[in-house]
């Protein structure tokens, strides 16, 4: 048993050592090689030894040098300015020669650099108008002043000369537009208008005074219809109110409902509806708790408009309410409504 433990211990130690060795080897393999271990290190050292005192190698290639911006301007820009100033001014017109190009190439001689011809910049009309009143002239550049002829512009030239110089017509200055003269408004005689208005008011007042005044007439008769609940039943306010609103009744004076000439509830009253029980009024805020044995519809004679038409509307409304509530329609004496009672009511309407 002890020998087995020893063997396992040795095998475990060997496995741990193998894992560590493999890990170090893989890490070293992944690291980049340094310059000392690079095969090109010796090549760069040999190239450095072969450079001369000025820093150029056998092929004439020197080391890379970094120069400041000031050094570049001194070495490049200054020689260009010197060559431009040393050149002779070039005339504005070029002469054409008959010498062919091949002859000029065959002739030996020192090579001369011909100055490049720079086309003169044409000043726009908007820019020229700025110099008409100013005597300050722009400073000529080194390239354009030597190659282009100077054009002298005289500020005292006329408009026609300016048009010929620029090649574009100068727009004429718009003349100020004078506002149109409005005709004077005619004078209104205020006093005359006031007098006319006063005269119209006086005429209207006299017409109203002469017109007969419709004084309220005392009623001579009252037509009454009763809607009575059936035996053992009562009329519920929650059912009565929707029926009245559908028939265009409106709650109003004396705390009862009225039917007006207008369906919106305005105008003269045609007939009214009251509670059969005393005091005969309604409480619209508590109609759900309201109960009664019956209601009464009444219309006074004479009334507004056609009495026969008004009674027809009242009779139809009574029929509809009785049907909605399941009640009975009675006459003024609380008797069942009949044809004989209807004829009696028509006679009373004609007598009124």
UniProtKB/Swiss-Prot annotation:
Topology Cytoplasmic: residue spans: 28-352
Xref: NCBIfam families: septum_zipA
Record-annotated membrane-spanning stretches: 7-27
Subcellular location: Cell inner membrane
Name of the coding gene: zipA
Compositionally biased region (Basic and acidic residues): 111-120
SMART domains: ZipA_C
Subunit and partners: Interacts with FtsZ via their C-terminal domains.
Biological process terms in GO annotation: division septum assembly; FtsZ-dependent cytokinesis
Positions on the Periplasmic side per record topology: 1-6
Superkingdom, natural source: Bacteria
Keywords annotated in UniProt: Cell cycle, Cell division, Cell inner membrane, Cell membrane, Membrane, Transmembrane, Transmembrane helix
One Pfam family recorded for the sequence: ZipA_C
Region called Disordered, residue ranges: 78-120, 138-160
Organism per entry: Shewanella frigidimarina (strain NCIMB 400)
Broad class of where this protein is predominantly found: membrane
Protein family: Belongs to the ZipA family.
Name the UniProt record assigns to this protein: Cell division protein ZipA
């Amino acid at each position: 048993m002890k020998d087995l433990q020893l063997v396992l211990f040795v095998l475990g130690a060997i496995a741990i050592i193998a894992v560590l060795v493999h890990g170090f080897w893989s890490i070293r393999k992944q690291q980049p090689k340094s310059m000392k271990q690079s095969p090109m290190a010796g090549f760069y050292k040999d190239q450095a030894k072969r450079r001369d005192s000025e820093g150029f190698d056998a092929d004439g290639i020197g080391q890379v040098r970094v120069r400041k911006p000031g050094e570049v301007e001194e070495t490049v820009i200054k020689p260009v300015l010197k060559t431009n100033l040393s050149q002779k001014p070039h005339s504005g017109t070029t002469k054409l020669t008959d010498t062919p190009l091949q002859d000029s190439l065959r002739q030996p001689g020192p090579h001369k650099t011909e100055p490049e011809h720079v086309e003169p910049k044409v000043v726009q009309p908007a820019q020229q108008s700025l110099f008409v009143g100013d005597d300050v002239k722009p400073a000529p550049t080194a390239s354009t002043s030597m190659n282009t002829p100077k054009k002298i512009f005289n500020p005292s030239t006329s408009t026609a000369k300016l048009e010929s110089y620029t090649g574009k017509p100068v727009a004429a200055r718009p003349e100020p537009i004078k506002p149109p003269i409005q005709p004077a408004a005619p004078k209104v005689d205020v006093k005359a208008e006031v007098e006319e208005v006063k005269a119209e008011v006086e005429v209207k007042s006299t017409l109203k005074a002469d017109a007969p005044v419709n004084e309220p007439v005392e009623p001579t008769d009252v037509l009454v219809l009763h809607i009575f609940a059936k035996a053992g039943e009562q009329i519920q306010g929650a059912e009565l109110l929707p029926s009245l609103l559908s028939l265009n009744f409106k709650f109003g004076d004396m705390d009862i409902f009225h039917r007006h000439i207008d369906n919106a509830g305005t105008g003269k009253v045609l007939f009214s509806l009251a509670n059969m029980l005393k005091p005969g009024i309604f409480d619209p805020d508590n109609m759900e708790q309201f109960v009664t044995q019956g209601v009464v519809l009444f219309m006074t004679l004479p009334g507004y408009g056609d009495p026969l038409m008004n009674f027809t509307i009242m009779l139809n409304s009574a029929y509809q309410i009785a049907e909605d509530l399941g009640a009975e329609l009675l006459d003024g004496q609380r008797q069942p409504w009949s044809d004989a009672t209807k004829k009696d009511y028509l006679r009373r309407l004609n007598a009124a």
